[in-house]
Design a protein with these regions (language model features):
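Alpha-helix C-terminal capping/helix-to-coil transition sites in glycosyltransferase folds
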Residues: 12, 96-97, 144
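Residue-level detector of alpha-helix initiation sites
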Residues: 22-23, 109, 155
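ADP-ribose/adenylate-binding Rossmann-like module
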Residues: 100-104, 111-137
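An accessory alpha-helical subdomain
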Residues: 155-220
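Hydrophobic, well-ordered beta-alpha structural blocks that scaffold small-molecule cofactor pockets
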Residues: 1-44, 48-52
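E1/E1-like adenylate-forming module used to activate ubiquitin-like modifiers
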Residues: 127-176
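Intrinsically disordered, low-complexity terminal tails and inter-domain linkers enriched
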Residues: 53-82
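Glycine-rich, highly charged phosphate/nucleotide-binding loops
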Residues: 80-96
Length: 220
């Protein structure tokens, strides 16, 4: 059975990532890209994640947590405000209050345990490379501002989805991302000015086609 494609607003939503390796880093990057608040629980973290921390984890609070370094990290300051690292082993209570959990450790048994706990408590969970333990999976995606295209093979062939992503990148360019922003800015004005759905559809199509043909975003 294919997975249902659903785009979810993750802005400021709580996401837990268990694990501190390169796979965990990639998941952190994705979740930050879509505005989530990310908590990472791991006994140790890879260099890429370490670059997000304050003075290479030199400063921790009394709970063992440490936050991102806004001046010395590779993300923007907004993203830095949305990352918390907890340096210790995973505990089940870490999942409480989370809307999404990603088990990205190198211990399949632990990933399975995390997934089972989340499913029993109604929490969406992804166990990396353990399809049977996942209630959702990550697609390959392209993102230009608010314009997003995603591909999923249902976990069967990541290589195929990467191929599709590469082909789509030839079409979904930064220009289209900018054009999508423009279309959003004029949307309410067009809706107010034209009374029928058919008229609005015609106007939107004319504006879109003209912009693509000219290779230029119209001025508002």
């Amino acid at each position: 059975m294919a997975y249902f494609p659903m785009f979810v607003d993750m802005t400021e939503r709580e996401c837990l990532i268990v694990g501190g390796g390169n796979v965990a880093y990639r998941k952190v990057s994705v979740m930050l890209d879509f505005g989530a608040k990310v908590t990472v629980v791991a006994e140790d973290i890879c260099d890429e994640l370490r670059k997000l921390t304050i003075d290479d984890i030199a400063s921790e609070d009394k709970t063992g947590s440490y936050t991102a370094n806004k001046e010395n990290n590779q993300t923007d300051s907004d993203a830095a405000d949305r990352i918390t690292f907890i340096k210790r082993r995973f505990e089940r209570k870490d999942c409480d209050g989370m809307e999404m959990v990603i088990a990205a450790t190198d211990d399949n048994a632990l990933n399975h345990e995390i997934a089972e706990y989340c499913k029993a408590n109604g929490i969406m969970v992804n166990a990396v490379d353990q399809k049977a333990d996942c209630s959702f999976i990550f697609p390959s995606y392209i993102k230009e501002k608010n314009l997003v295209a995603a591909f999923s093979s249902g976990g069967n062939s990541p290589v195929l989805t990467q191929y599709l992503k590469c082909k789509e990148q030839e079409i979904l360019t930064p220009f289209l991302g900018e054009l999508n922003e423009y279309m959003g800015q004029i949307r309410e004005k067009v809706i107010a000015q034209y009374g029928t759905e058919a008229e609005r559809k015609r106007v939107f199509k004319e504006i879109l086609c003209a912009a693509i043909d000219n290779g230029k975003i119209p001025e508002i």
